[in-house]
Amino acid sequence: MTGMEPIAHIHTDLPQKFGIPRNSFLAPHLQGRIVFEPEFASNAAVEGLDSFSHLWLMWRFENGTPGGTAKDIAADAKSRDRSGTNAKWSKTVRPPRLGGAERVGVFATRSPFRPNPIGLTCVKLDHVELTDDGPIIHVLGADLRDGTPIYDIKPYIPFADCHPDATGGWIEDAPWQELDVEFPQALQDMVPPAKISGLVEVLRQDPRRAGSKHEPNRVYHLAYAGLDISFTVDETQLTVVAVNDAQD
């Protein structure tokens, strides 16, 4: 963005586009750490921030991915299929919530393929860690890829930002179908306990591309927290079948 530079980058457990929630708070236990660039790494700059419960993050899309480049966009962690990527904006888009079939205007969506690649996310503030190298802001519920550049941070102010009479447009007529997740205990034991809740929430949202074919025998791979999570999907049932260390 012309005349602007990142003040920080967020570090999350999702290194690829595949698996990133389509909106914040769909996976409310997803952990994120915002680490400032040296020029902005001042403990004084975040004084008073910990009195707020939620924050707004302004960030940048890169080639349609929160913090990624075209080579990072993958259908799953194994294939690195980059089909469907596009560095240009589109006047109309196919929202996943509509099954990837119907088109609506880009400005009536939060599609990444916009004239200006700006993203806006609301997150829950977990805590602010003050270090000798500057503050680290720990947040929950971010829908951002690991390494996404952050351009600004603002407090969420309830009386100004919360509108009880707000309506959701076409989204209200397109409820999202969550998946039932079967995660054998033996495989759960291979995931750090603090990462389990966020992982299950990501899987429940169905990481697959909208309109994916019914392929109950296909094994998908999700890169998460340094792990390769293998799973299958049959109708509305997602089953985790393996957990391994992620391959570089």
Each model region followed by its residue ranges:
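Glycine-rich, low-complexity intrinsically disordered segments
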Residues: 1-122, 126-248
